[in-house]
């Protein structure tokens, strides 16, 4: 057992023995002063003779005091006991006005003002069976509302104090309320919780779990508003602005210095133009230019108009393969785009290989035209702008070669509805997927789609 515990137990026993001796002497004193001399002598022979310390204390108290100490404290206790609200309302014994005022003042005392009603020192036992268990003035279960144990523990936390119904009937403003902590101070009971630190942790919750807002202010800043907050742009829980939702229309360009969210790798840069929701951003940004689009065709818009990087194919449409349309050199309607698409190609010995055809972009007003593909490469189909049923350059005219320099060419037309056709008959014995029969079926499907667009 630790030495401190042993010392406390010894002090408790010594204090209890002293209290018993004093009580015995005060009883003998009370009997002497009230005229019960025979009873006092009998009490002395039976009790004080076995306890010399109590007899000595009784002799000293009788000589030094002309009044009974026990009687004085009993009168004080009984006055306060009778003035308690639950007893005075029931019409009990009379009490003084001072005792009534004492109870009213103790009820209205704010929490934390212990005064001399604080709990006794550690180690002193409470006489739970005695009416004046608490400090010799209050009945069992009665404790001033302001009397609190060290550390702010309410009286109900001690098993020796049963719950007081009067304290339960107290108004909310009279209860032991805890004021809110000042700014920057820790919350009560929040000690020991994880405290993540690092860049992007704006709020100092002092022990409470914090959320890392990307792009937030440095530590010490206020909480970030959520989307819809008036007077501010708002912040989403992941730190992105409302117009920067991933893969959604009108997606903005994220800042270059934005840290990754939850350890995820940064997303590749995308263009500021809108794209369908949920569509990947594998393509490079396209340069938009002013051009007239054919009716029903999905095109990239002019300046200020969001251009479509890709479109969702409609029912019955043919999947897109490696194809592109290239405008004339210096034409502002040309679109620079670089696609890497594997394409099947037949060599002279009949073996099938995969060749990646890289079509370099052509910008408006810069550089030379794209060189024609090799003779063995499959040519792409070009659709030239115009109106339905127009001359060469209309949506119904199809060229089997790249047509640079044509004034009526419209490279902004939708390539999804124009599958590529073979530039010529395949060599004998080849297993080309685009044979004559397949070309005929594809032509029928293409004509049906074009008729549906132009209808």
Curated annotation (Swiss-Prot):
Gene Ontology BP terms: branching morphogenesis of a nerve; negative regulation of gene expression; positive regulation of transcription by RNA polymerase II; regulation of protein localization to synapse; synapse assembly
GO cellular component terms listed in the entry, alphabetical order: cytoplasm; nucleus
Biased composition, class Polar residues, residue ranges: 396-406
Domain LisH: 19-51
Record-linked PROSITE patterns: LISH
InterPro entries cross-referenced by the UniProt entry: LisH
Presence of keyword Nucleus: yes
Tissue: Ubiquitously expressed with higher expression in the head and tail ganglia, the vulva and PLM neurons.
Role noted for this protein: Involved cell autonomously in PLM neuron pre-synaptic differentiation by negatively regulating prk-2 expression and in neurite branch positioning.
PANTHER family, per database record: SEQUENCE-SPECIFIC SINGLE-STRANDED DNA-BINDING PROTEIN, ISOFORM D, SINGLE STRANDED DNA BINDING PROTEIN
Low complexity bias: start-end ranges: 288-298, 321-336, 407-421
Protein name: Single-stranded DNA-binding protein homolog sam-10
Consequence of gene loss (knockout): Defects in PLM neuron synaptic differentiation characterized by a misalignment of active zones and synaptic vesicles, branch point anterior to the vulva and overextension of synaptic branch. DD motoneurons display similar pre-synaptic defects. Increased expression of prk-2. In addition, mutants display a moderate uncoordinated movement, a small decrease in body size, a defect in egg laying and a slower growth.
Keyword entries, A-Z: Cytoplasm, Neurogenesis, Nucleus
Species of origin: Caenorhabditis elegans
Start and end residues of each stretch annotated as Disordered: 217-249, 281-302, 314-343, 357-442
Compartments where located: Cytoplasm; Nucleus
